[in-house]
From Swiss-Prot:
It catalyses: (6R)-NADHX = (6S)-NADHX; (6R)-NADPHX = (6S)-NADPHX. This is NAD(P)H-hydrate epimerase. K(+) binds at residues 63, 142, 179. Catalyzes the epimerization of the S- and R-forms of NAD(P)HX, a damaged form of NAD(P)H that is a result of enzymatic or heat-dependent hydration. This is a prerequisite for the S-specific NAD(P)H-hydrate dehydratase to allow the repair of both epimers of NAD(P)HX. GO terms for molecular function: metal ion binding; NAD(P)HX epimerase activity; nucleotide binding. SUPFAM superfamilies: YjeF N-terminal domain-like. The keyword NAD applies. Keywords: Isomerase, Metal-binding, NAD, NADP, Nucleotide-binding, Potassium. Its cofactor is K(+). Residues 10-227 form the YjeF N-terminal domain.
Length: 227
């Protein structure tokens, strides 16, 4: 197996694991979410105890499903958590939809929908005010898009620009790969079109996208989830 995986190679590994019965999609998503929290606490030990506040950005696919697992697990640990959902939950993949429902059932008042595919300026302003306005957010998690993204995120520009404008107000964590970073590098020329990660938590092996976008990834931690 190569030391660095492409998106298609990683998906093939996951499919083989599912087909063999070694793990289900829900189990793998739970492991991924827990591994992000483990990496976060390893990287920022002061966050492992006490009360903290996280904002989770969840996208329309399985990366978003990982985000809902992270939200739920942090909430159970006593964190204040708010989720911004950039998706129609009814169109999410089955396992991601199941984790969306688990989160909403647990904390129905802590999820904010934002327009998909194009975020409205007023929504981005509200996101900025709620996420950064009081200066108390500790962690912003990017669970919008994972590996294999091949199109610019023009509809998300207002959110990405807000994150960059508040770059030093929180610890920014990307799940698998910073959103806006494709396999061959950034999908757009502007630096602010890629989520500004301090920590990127990826699974099983480093990915080609990381190698072609190291300056956007911050610290890269590889977590093993049983594939």
């Amino acid at each position: 197996m190569p030391d660095i995986l492409t998106a298609s190679q990683m998906r093939a590994l996951e499919t083989a694991a599912f087909n063999s019965g070694a793990v289900t999609g829900l189990e793998l998503m739970e492991r991924a979410g827990q591994s992000v929290i483990d990496a976060l606490f390893s990287s920022k030990a002061e966050l492992a105890t006490g009360e903290h506040r996280a904002v989770i950005l969840c996208g329309p696919g399985n990366n978003g499903g990982d985000g809902f697992v992270i939200a739920r697990l942090l909430f159970v640990l006593g964190w204040q958590v708010r989720v911004y959902l950039y998706a129609d939950p009814e169109k999410m993949p089955r396992d991601a939809h199941a984790n969306h429902d688990s989160w909403v059932d647990l904390v129905p008042e802590c999820t904010q929908r934002i327009s998909f595919p194009s975020v409205l300026p007023a929504e981005a302003e509200r996101f900025g005010d709620e996420a950064f306005g009081n200066g108390e957010v500790d962690v912003i998690v990017d669970a919008l898009f994972g590996i294999g993204l091949n199109r610019p995120l023009s509809g998300l520009h207002p959110i990405l620009a807000t994150c960059h404008a508040n770059r030093h107000e929180a610890y920014f964590v990307a799940v698998d790969v910073p959103s806006g970073l494709g396999e061959n590098g950034p999908l757009e020329a502007a630096d602010w079109s890629v989520f500004p990660a301090d920590l990127t938590v990826t699974f099983h092996r480093p990915k080609q996208a990381h190698q072609n976008g190291l300056s956007f990834c911050g610290k890269i931690m590889v977590q093993y989830i049983g594939l």
